[in-house]
Amino acid sequence: MNWGFLQGILSGVNKYSTALGRIWLSVVFIFRVLVYVVAAEEVWDDDQKDFICNTKQPGCPNVCYDEFFPVSHVRLWALQLILVTCPSLLVVMHVAYREERERKHRLKHGPNAPALYSNLSKKRGGLWWTYLLSLIFKAAVDSGFLYIFHCIYKDYDMPRVVACSVTPCPHTVDCYIARPTEKKVFTYFMVVTAAICILLNLSEVVYLVGKRCMEVFRPRRRKASRRHQLPDTCPPYVISKGGHPQDESVILTKAGMATVDAGVYP
């Protein structure tokens, strides 16, 4: 399988990612894609041919293999890696849409017209939601595939010998799996790396939401605090009634200073 196209997509989205997003890309490239291409495919190569049962009944090894391996590990992993990296393409497409919209705006209103976006790749507005939803989708895909693996292969185990009694086997036969320990190690490795990617995605979701909440509520708190603070140019005054009974003038007395006649206000 050619993974060059997938590598180009992930490399393009790397410049729009946060620090946690770049760590996720490194984990996907080094610990998942490379391990899959270099080692995992070789371990499961001709797996059905090496699945041997102690019977000469025609068709029995084939149905037993299908019973215990309904879907190959490597094919499930390939589908998982493709689906988990596709949301990154949405981010690249959204940025490309912004660039095209900005270009048309410049052509229509001239090169000196104010820009539609202060920073095309900055995660604001729709791009922020696209990036956030891509993280949630990637975490959901990895979680779903881990659940599928757990349902198909109990506890992600790889036994050395399995007992099969499926028709057309004449009786319960023992079937032997090729390189079970090596396959178990790779299975656990892929499960652990998928769990790490889920944790990184959820951490990035928390980071983005928390950062956005701070940007929204911090200016409001500053405005509220400024409203409750009295400026230094307006010191406190003591308000008292004047002594003239006809005009009821008001006397403003500042602490430590002479009284000021404020007059009568309608």
From Swiss-Prot:
What residue ranges lie in the Cytoplasmic compartment?
A: 14-20, 95-130, 206-266
Biological process annotations from GO: cell-cell signaling; gap junction-mediated intercellular transport; olfactory behavior; sensory perception of smell
Give the Extracellular membrane side ranges.
41-73, 152-184
For this UniProt entry, the molecular function terms from Gene Ontology, in alphabetical order, are: gap junction channel activity
Q: Name one GO cellular component term.
A: connexin complex
- Describe the function of this protein: Structural component of gap junctions. Gap junctions are dodecameric channels that connect the cytoplasm of adjoining cells. They are formed by the docking of two hexameric hemichannels, one from each cell membrane. Small molecules and ions diffuse from one cell to a neighboring cell via the central pore.
Name this protein carries in UniProt: Gap junction beta-4 protein
The organism named in the record is Mus musculus (Mouse)
- Name the gene: Gjb4
